[in-house]
Amino acid sequence: MNQMLFVTKRNGKIELINLDKIHRVLNWAAKGLENISISQVALKSRIQFYNNIKTTIIHETIIKAAADLISENSPDYQYMAARLTIFHLRKKAFGQFNPPNLYDHVKNMIKLEKYDQHLLNDYPKQDFLIMNSFIKHRRDMNFSYAAVKQLEGKYLIQNRVTKKIYESAQFLYILISACLFSKYPNETRMKYIKNFYDAISTFKISLPTPIMAGLRTPTRQFSSCVLIESEDNLNSINATTSAIVKYVSQRAGIGINAGRIRALGSPIRNGDTLHTGCIPFYKHFQSAVKSCSQGGVRGGAATIFYPIWHFEIESLLVLKNNRGIEENRVRHMDYSVQLNKLMYQRLILGEHITLFSPSDVPNLYDSFFNNQEKFERLYIKYENDKTIRKKKVKASYLFSLMMQERTSTGRIYIQNVDHCNSHSAFNPKIAPIRQSNLCLEITLPTKALQDVHDKNGEISLCTLSAINLGSLNNLNDLSKLSNLIVRALDSVLDYQEYPILSAKKSALSRRTLGIGVINFAYYLAKNGVRYSDGSANNLTHRTFEAIQYHLLNASCVLAQEKGACHWFSHTNYYKGILPIDTYKKNVDEICNEPLHLDWELLRKKIKKYGLRNSTLSALMPSETSSQISNATNGIEPPRGLISIKASKDGMLRQVVPEYKRLKNNYELLWNIPNNTGYLQLASIMQKFVDQSISANTNYDPKLFPNNKIPMQQLILDLLTAYKLGLKTLYYQNTRDGASDHQTEDIQFSKNENCNHGACKI
């Protein structure tokens, strides 16, 4: 019957269907793959054909037929579906399978105002011919189906109204490289462009969404994370709101420190009126966050930070839950509770926590971050001052409420502010850490703005990227990769534009980077070690020692070449203090691996030449970009050997790397009996990482009596994380049984890990 069907071609011409042509394309897409049935894909497709069907719909039907066959027994369908999609995208972009040459493509795209004019200004035609020779378009065939769909949905330049695609992946990679090294000397820039292109197009380095989606376009804002602090006055609150709108519209995820805002009922202007409290202003922030999508790529998102001793804490902890009414809930942001040693001590000793409005207790709020001894002294003093409004609550009640809300929403995060400042890249006396970002991996100094043009405020930005651990042949590879990644991200800081002066001043003075990892689960599987039993501890120590060492060394080399960052004196590195000096020594009880690299030589070099960047490392979530690299997410264990990830492009099946060879080596999330092994590994990483880690906790209620997670277990894991020096905790994942109908190795995963915000890669 199909032989008599007519089809409408892309050019509008109608002709008889050519099944031989379809089979030729299917044969091409299946070449070299195992366990593929071309006839099965053809059969599944043809039953959906109809008269006058468009050839574009035929192509999409074939792609879906192949993608639906991705399974445990036939994982190679992910590559067949990917190749068919690449073919389809190239036809949409170029009208043919073979891409044009780079120079003609760039000229055309600049004419269409899709690419930045500087590409033609900075590079003569001869350079484009050289860059064109670097491009390996066949690398498009290394993408998995999930990767190609993410490219299509988020990263390739397109008209989001008409769905017109304008480029292919290799053009994206070469032009990102060209943009980043455009100001390098003529004699070296082609070398760096080629090396960086090779590293990103072969998935050795993973780039964040703002860079992948925007770098090469006229829009120049590529920092993934923005940290904004609000003061306790209307001018500052409104300046914060303005800053949020500007950055959300430009692809950034937001961290908002609202901890200074005074409590409900506090006096204003010596009692002229009473304060409305935090919630109305949180709603104000929420409206700003949701006012824009992030450059058409994803919706805005933010995390708000406040201390556990805030007078309104009981109302703030429940803002995200589904109970209550609209007036007393602010559900469309996430929240992070700030803790320190004194608060944990009150819990352990069965004592009370006293709640204050920050406006009533001079210097308490600032000392909470920059001086723990002073904080404890002032806190006890104010507890005994009968003239100050306060409320005493049992520490066990407050921690239980916090952990209950963390469990029910999954999105109440933890920041240990003392660890953030004692094990910091920054000197807390000069540049204290008072908040984190959307996903809790960034710890940078901030200062509230009084208006959006305030030169004295500080909005902190962090530019992210990640090393693909699965691509390493050995730890020596990290030297070259670190050099490339530090140079590239440092160039981003000079290349991008800054909508707010205080952000520009901070970014160019501190030059902070956050370089993390992807594919850690594959790295463990490849090395035959596991999350849960301690077998990965020493490997993790050696790996993250090498990562931080080589990143610092690369930044020091760049400082010799271009100068140290202007505010290098604000860092502990300036004093010769390294992460290996300030980590929580309890880590030594779980890992006795010695240091293997010459840290004393590095210390001398840093003291002599400085660093180009105030910070180098942060371990972020990477749900989307890890799919591009066909890698596992960040440091997380996979939920299944084949995960079905819900995204706006539909259900995407992603297979773990080297499934056939290593399927018995992977330790899946819900097969890990408890959080202890994971928290130990995270603490070993934190020993070296100079910012923080988006570390999660995970619970399967079926492992506990009556299918209920005991509060004692939740608190125990929280205390373990603190004892081992973790600065932050991100999501709490609770197994809900939604995936029980799948086979053991196929798990659903909502693509929510930092899905709306850009603080992931």
From Swiss-Prot:
Domain named ATP-cone: residues: 5-95
Cystine pairs: 225-462
Residues annotated as the enzyme's active site: 437 (proton acceptor), 439 (cysteine radical intermediate), 441 (proton acceptor)
Key word Nucleotide-binding present: yes
Source taxon at top rank: Bacteria
PROSITE patterns xref list: ATP_CONE, RIBORED_LARGE
Catalytic activity annotation: a 2'-deoxyribonucleoside 5'-diphosphate + [thioredoxin]-disulfide + H2O = a ribonucleoside 5'-diphosphate + [thioredoxin]-dithiol
Residue sites binding dTTP per the record: 232-234, 262, 269
Site (Interacts with thioredoxin/glutaredoxin): 754, 759
Assigned GO CC terms: ribonucleoside-diphosphate reductase complex
GO molecular function terms listed in the Swiss-Prot or TrEMBL record: ATP binding; ribonucleoside-diphosphate reductase activity, thioredoxin disulfide as acceptor
EC number: 1.17.4.1
Residues annotated to bind ATP: 9, 15-21, 55, 91
Record-level GO BP terms: deoxyribonucleotide biosynthetic process
Residues annotated as binding GDP: 209, 437, 441, 623-625
Notes on activation and inhibition: Under complex allosteric control mediated by deoxynucleoside triphosphates and ATP binding to separate specificity and activation sites on the alpha subunit. The type of nucleotide bound at the specificity site determines substrate preference. It seems probable that ATP makes the enzyme reduce CDP and UDP, dGTP favors ADP reduction and dTTP favors GDP reduction. Stimulated by ATP and inhibited by dATP binding to the activity site.
Protein family per UniProt: Belongs to the ribonucleoside diphosphate reductase large chain family.
Subunit structure, as described in the record: Tetramer of two alpha and two beta subunits.
Protein name: Ribonucleoside-diphosphate reductase subunit alpha
Provenance organism: Buchnera aphidicola subsp. Baizongia pistaciae (strain Bp)
Gene name of the record: nrdA
